[in-house]
């Protein structure tokens, strides 16, 4: 049975049993920053199992695409070297949300395996948890499974979502490949060998684990099952390795053709075939190669595949060409793969071209390090150098080491990385900035959402990194209050500035930072003194704060607009929100076009004109996700989060602790000022709002008015007029070039009279007025043809620069080299140059010395 037929048979069987067919979810988990990639069929139903979400069905079935290549579930290093490890796989599953339980789940599984697929019962082995008498009775007494092919196991047969929450026993079904294959049954010492292969896991969620470890029965027990498509396909197709099934054969052949490898058993081909699946589907689902988070895992996968291609002798881009074979194999099951084929190929090719430039050099460094190795462990500093200089992820280096029976010093690598991070922190800090080193016990309440001025108490003072009781006039330091309206730098938003005032004392705040639970006001005591326990009025710079708020709110609107215009793959990669402008880095593989920029601006300004209220709501993190609020992967959120909503019809909803305008109309105006690359796969937009946006538009209008006046046109017709003038300039430049060539041709004829005979050799060394380098080269070719046999040097002067061309006809190159002659002349005019024996060019910076340099050519030939 083909894999596609197997996938369809599974879904059809469970649909016939009252299950709703649910499409595979994205490999990027929706609103779940705790999960790197979708790695199981139940991921998209997690909130249903937890009771946080309800759906209009209680039975579901799916074929879920999954990736395991990072974090807790990481199969990357084993891929290609074992029969069943993959970075990408499909998980067939059936699910019950408080509907059926153990009896039906077991019956469905047994009926599908032995009935629909026709697997012999004597080839199947079943396990249950040691405590699960109910499941054991169903298998042994109702399904008729032989006690000789049945076992009770402990922790291997108990599943839990986390330290607390839903959990329960599981039942696993194994396929026995026969006595001629090494290995023992589940639970034996040899269970990890290849004879008995797990093909299906049935999880019975019947308990809720409490913080104290107690297992309380769930009111609605549920079922979550998973069967790897590739594994069961291998069983049905009579092969022991997943790489031998039909899904991989076309990919292996395409990889072999692309790399020139003829051995389809080659492990590197298996790596490439596996990795084109995971890389393509990840890009399809919006992940872009980068140096952080999901993008970094994708980059590691791609670079590992490229390294194996290089190992097979392929040093040109090849990986992106395999996408077509993948689409042909899986495009029918996943139509989105075909729709995104061009984008996937483009992203892979860009990564190949970028890494290809350093792969060969990095491999030379690694090979050299291995040759010089004294022992069997590759040092951590070698791994660090390869990563830092050549972009080699450490697991790629470990992959090479593994092939040579070497191990790697990962602890040494981590130590080198930590040292680099420490150096970076030191380099990025001001000499007198001690705030990073402070350990502050105080807790500051933030009142800045409601107030821009507040009366507070000083609870801590610091000078030169040390706690003090008093700050006096003229001293720089840091002040901690019990409560403050000053926003501390966080989430890309800059810290507030302003003043702390008490009677005659004034402390000017130049920055506000968060250290532990305290807000640290950084600045200078300009008059009077502050003491611990003293009262102050904390006054935020209102105009600056309002400008920051406009830019922060505009950032949210722009983020939503980017996802609307460019696609759901857009994810925030970094941001800066200041009073003057906003900067936003996001995942996207190509430049944003002018038309797209305009559409983004229109969408944002439309929301500004709508002048809708900006609302914030405090809720727990799970409720926020359920409400559709965007969460950033890798961010750590408190149990209670602020959900910020703005724009009409739910235009933008994100988790955010920053300060924002009350209504979108308060932003005033939005204008993009820059769009550029920030890193591979990451674009950057800078924009301004309010009066800054108006100032930008006024400057642009003034510039346009000046251009229109220069070309004698109205503003509306200025662009057409400039295009017309530019075309005329191009035509005139062509005419000038034509006249130069004509001049050179005429000059070439005139110059023959200057030829001198030096020891039987025709020699010409002269300056041509008004010529450039190209004219000199054309003239040289004409003179060589005309003279037949000669040594020639031509020069031209433009300003303070000298252009030189030397030529020697073919018959004289054994004795005279144009490169040597050019170097001889160029050095005399403070320049340099070089070239072939028959033609060389260069220049200099001393026109005054040119006559003497040309005169010396005759002596050079005569030597």
UniProtKB/Swiss-Prot annotation:
Transmembrane segments: none annotated. Zn(2+) binds at residues 552, 556, 656, 660. Keywords: Aminoacyl-tRNA synthetase, ATP-binding, Cytoplasm, Ligase, Metal-binding, Nucleotide-binding, Protein biosynthesis, RNA-binding, tRNA-binding, Zinc. GO terms for molecular function: alanine-tRNA ligase activity; aminoacyl-tRNA deacylase activity; ATP binding; tRNA binding; zinc ion binding. Pfam families: DHHA1, tRNA-synt_2c, tRNA_SAD. It is found in: Cytoplasm. GO terms for cellular component: cytosol. Its cofactor is Zn(2+). Its EC number is 6.1.1.7. SMART domains: tRNA_SAD. It is an enzyme of class 6 (ligase). Its main location: cytoplasm. It catalyses: tRNA(Ala) + L-alanine + ATP = L-alanyl-tRNA(Ala) + AMP + diphosphate. It comes from the Bacteria. Consists of three domains; the N-terminal catalytic domain, the editing domain and the C-terminal C-Ala domain. The editing domain removes incorrectly charged amino acids, while the C-Ala domain, along with tRNA(Ala), serves as a bridge to cooperatively bring together the editing and aminoacylation centers thus stimulating deacylation of misacylated tRNAs. Belongs to the class-II aminoacyl-tRNA synthetase family. This is Alanine--tRNA ligase. It comes from Alcanivorax borkumensis (strain ATCC 700651 / DSM 11573 / NCIMB 13689 / SK2). The gene is alaS.
């Amino acid at each position: 049975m083909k894999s596609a037929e197997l996938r369809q048979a599974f879904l059809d069987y469970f649909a016939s049993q009252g299950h709703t067919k649910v499409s595979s979810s994205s490999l990027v988990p929706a609103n779940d920053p705790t999960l790197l990639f979708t790695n199981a069929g139940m991921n998209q139903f997690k909130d249903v199992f937890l009771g946080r979400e309800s759906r209009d069905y209680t039975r579901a079935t799916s074929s879920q695409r999954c990736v395991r290549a990072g974090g807790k579930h990481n199969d990357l290093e084993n891929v290609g070297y074992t029969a069943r490890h993959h970075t990408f796989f499909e998980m067939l599953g059936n699910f019950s949300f408080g509907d059926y339980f153990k009896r039906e789940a077991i019956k469905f599984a047994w009926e599908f395996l032995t009935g629909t697929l026709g697997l012999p019962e004597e080839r199947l082995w079943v396990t249950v948890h040691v405590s699960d008498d109910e499941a054991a009775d169903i298998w042994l007494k109702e399904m008729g499974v032989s006690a000789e092919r049945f076992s009770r196991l402990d922790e291997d047969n108990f599943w839990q979502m986390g330290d607390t929450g839903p959990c329960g026993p599981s039942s696993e079904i194994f396929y026995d490949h026969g006595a001629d294959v090494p290995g023992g049954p589940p639970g034996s010492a040899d269970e990890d060998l290849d004879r008995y292969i797990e093909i299906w896991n049935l999880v019975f969620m019947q308990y809720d684990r409490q913080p104290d470890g107690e297992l309380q029965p769930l009111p609605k027990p549920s079922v979550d099952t998973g069967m790897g498509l590739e594994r069961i396909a291998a069983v049905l197709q009579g092969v022991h390795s997943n790489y031998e099934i039909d899904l991989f054969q076309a990919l292996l052949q395409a990889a072999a053709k692309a790399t020139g490898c003829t051995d389809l058993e080659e492990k590197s081909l298996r790596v490439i075939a596996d990795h084109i699946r995971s890389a393509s589907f990840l890009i399809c689902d919006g992940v872009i190669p980068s140096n952080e988070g999901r993008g970094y895992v994708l980059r590691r996968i791609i670079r590992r595949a490229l390294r194996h291609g290089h190992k097979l002798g392929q040093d040109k881009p090849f990986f992106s060409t395999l996408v077509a074979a993948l689409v042909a194999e899986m495009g029918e099951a996943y139509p989105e793969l075909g729709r995104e084929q061009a984008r996937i190929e483009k992203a892979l090719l860009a990564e190949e071209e970028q890494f290809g430039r350093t792969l060969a050099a990095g491999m030379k460094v690694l090979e050299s390090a291995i040759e010089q190795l004294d022992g069997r462990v590759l040092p951590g500093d070698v791994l660090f150098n390869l990563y830092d200089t050549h972009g080699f992820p450490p697991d790629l280096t470990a992959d090479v080491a593994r092939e040579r029976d070497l191990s790697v010093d990962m602890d040494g690598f981590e130590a080198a990385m930590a040292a680099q991070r420490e150096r970076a922190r030191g380099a990025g800090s001001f000499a007198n900035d001690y705030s990073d080193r402070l350990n502050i016990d105080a807790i500051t309440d933030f009142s800045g959402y409601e107030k821009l001025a507040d009366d507070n108490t000083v609870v801590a003072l610091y000078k030169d990194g040390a706690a003090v009781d008093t700050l006096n006039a003229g001293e720089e330091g840091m002040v901690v209050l019990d409560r403050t309206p000053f926003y501390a730098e966080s989430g890309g938003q800059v810290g507030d500035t302003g003043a702390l005032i008490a009677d005659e004392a004034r402390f000017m705040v130049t920055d506000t930072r968060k250290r532990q639970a305290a807000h640290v006001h950084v600045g200078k005591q300009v008059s009077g003194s502050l003491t611990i326990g003293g009262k102050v009025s904390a006054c935020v710079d209102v105009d600056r704060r309002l400008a920051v708020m406009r830019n922060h709110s505009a950032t949210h609107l722009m983020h939503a607009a980017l996802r609307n215009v460019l696609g759901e793959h857009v994810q925030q990669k970094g941001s800066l929100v200041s009073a003057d402008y906003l900067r936003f880095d996001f995942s996207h593989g190509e430049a944003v076009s002018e038309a797209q920029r305009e559409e983004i601006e229109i969408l944002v300004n439309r929301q500004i004109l709508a002048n809708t209220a900006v609302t914030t709501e405090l809720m727990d993190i799970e409720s926020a996700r359920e409400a559709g609020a965007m969460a950033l992967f890798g961010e750590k959120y408190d149990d209670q989060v602020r959900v910020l909503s703005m724009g009409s019809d739910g235009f933008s909803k994100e988790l955010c602790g920053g300060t924002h305008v009350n209504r979108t109309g308060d932003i005033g105006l939005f204008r993009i000022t820059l769009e550029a690359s920030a890193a591979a796969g990451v674009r950057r937009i800078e924009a301004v709002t309010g009066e800054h946006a108006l100032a930008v538009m006024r400057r642009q209008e003034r510039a346009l008015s000046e251009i229109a006046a220069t070309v004698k046109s109205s503003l509306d017709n200025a662009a057409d007029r400039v295009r017309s003038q530019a075309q005329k300039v191009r035509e005139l430049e062509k005419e000038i070039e034509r006249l130069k060539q004509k001049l050179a041709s005429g000059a070439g004829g005139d110059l023959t009279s200057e030829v001198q005979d030096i020891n039987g050799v025709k020699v010409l060394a002269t300056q041509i007025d008004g010529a450039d380098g190209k004219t000199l080269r054309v003239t040289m070719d004409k003179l060589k043809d005309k003279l037949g046999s000669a040594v020639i040097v031509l020069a031209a002067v433009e300003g303070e620069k000298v252009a030189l061309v030397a030529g020697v006809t073919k018959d004289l190159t054994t004795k005279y080299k144009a490169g040597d002659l050019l170097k001889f002349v160029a050095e005399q005019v403070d320049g340099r140059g070089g070239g072939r024996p028959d033609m060389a060019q260069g220049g200099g910076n001393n026109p005054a010395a040119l006559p003497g340099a040309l005169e010396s050519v005759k002596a050079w030939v005569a030597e």
